[in-house]
């Protein structure tokens, strides 16, 4: 893994490196089960993350990692190098603030990470992304996060059309800049005109309505 990290580091000028370390559903199973039985899954996780973060710091990088696992035991953040940034993510329209709160209370440096709602969808969940991004940016301000990282994923072969993520990307810029912004419909009209060249100002509202018509998503079609 460290050799792979060094190969990747050589390709980018940034001083940041995201080791990911999220959704570790299989940790403590298979070959790692005896060690997990001895140490516990959370200890197994944090020891490995710590080793990679310390390696990155020694290489002059600022480590980042996704926070979905550590939020179950947020006090473990104190064991990581002080340069480490926790990427606290959540993509629901009514995303709860628990994860952002507990990581802030534990003293973590964190970015709040909403999403544009395109992955596994025929059409981006436009209204969902508007609500999610507004909420997560609000949590970022409330808990003094160091930044916002707006995400766009491409699960299961990236069926989602990249151009349809533009509204969510613009919502991220708008809400991370400040709390006072236009309502959903008004902002969508501006995005339609400026990002898509639609003089009627209705294109993004049509996108939002199209998303509401979906009977099943790409995950259901592809996996289930």
Question: Which residue stretches match the model-derived regions?
Answer:
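Substrate-binding groove of N-acetylhexosamine-processing glycoside hydrolases
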Residues: 2-10, 14-16, 23, 35-224
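Short acidic/His/Gly/Ser-rich catalytic and metal-binding motifs that mark active-site loops
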Residues: 26-31
């Amino acid at each position: 893994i460290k050799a792979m990290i060094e190969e990747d580091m050589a390709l980018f000028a940034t001083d940041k490196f995201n080791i990911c370390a999220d959704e570790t559903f299989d940790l403590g199973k298979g070959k790692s089960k005896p060690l997990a039985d001895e140490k516990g899954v959370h200890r197994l996780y944090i020891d490995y993350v710590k080793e990679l973060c310390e390696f990155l710091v020694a290489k002059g990088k600022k480590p980042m990692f996704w926070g979905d696992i550590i939020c179950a035991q947020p006090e473990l953040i104190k064991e990581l190098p002080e340069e480490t940034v926790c990427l606290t993510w959540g993509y629901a329209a009514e995303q709860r603030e628990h994860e952002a709160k507990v990581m802030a209370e534990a003293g973590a440096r964190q970015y709040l990470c909403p999403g544009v709602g395109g992955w596994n969808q025929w059409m981006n969940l436009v209204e969902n992304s508007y609500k999610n991004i507004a909420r997560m940016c609000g949590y970022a301000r409330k808990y003094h996060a160091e930044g916002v990282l707006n995400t766009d994923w491409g699960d299961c072969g990236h069926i989602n059309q990249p151009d349809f993520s533009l509204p969510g990307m613009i919502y991220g810029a708008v809400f991370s800049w400040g709390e006072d912004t236009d309502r959903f419909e008004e902002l969508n009209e501006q995005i339609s005109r400026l990002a898509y060249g639609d003089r009627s100002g209705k294109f993004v509202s049509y996108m939002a309505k199209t998303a509401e018509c979906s009977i099943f998503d790409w995950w259901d079609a592809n996996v289930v």
